[in-house]
Amino acid sequence: MSLAASDTFRAAAGEQLETWASRTGAHLVGQARGADPGAVAFDAVQAAQARGSDVLIVDTAGRLHTREPLMQELAKVRRVLEKASGRPPDEVLLVLDATTGQNGFAQARLFHEAIGLSGLCLTKLDGTAKGGIVLRIHRELKLPIKLVGVGERVDDLQGFDAEKFAAALVPEPE
């Protein structure tokens, strides 16, 4: 597995991803802070192919869906990945904070329009947030929830279990 540090703007983003690479045994590809995220993605595809990695995860900077230049940058990263690998990505996931609320729908819709999402990763389900907005996202945008984050450890990123999610969202009366 390889990780691409395409979040070249947030302070300590590369270091944070380096920690995850170390924890998981993944190979990390990155460049200097402020580098072009598309260039990092291109280098990462080449490095992953050279190493025989079967999975490449490209971490991009968080961004507001209302900032058009940042959304265009994200679309560019996707185009670079497709061109460098010769095919579309297997997955394009939006990582959505479970505390986001109704704004999450607009965010998902605009990200989906810009880069063609394949699903969602819902994080921070270990707190009090329920993540109910994903029901609307799933219903109206036809985007499945693929992963959920329930903590800070490697094993806390889990496959989505609809029954477990529904039980947490609407618990049985006691």
Language model feature labels by segment:
Residues 1-174:
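P-loop/Walker A NTP-binding module and the surrounding RecA-like catalytic core of P-loop NTPases
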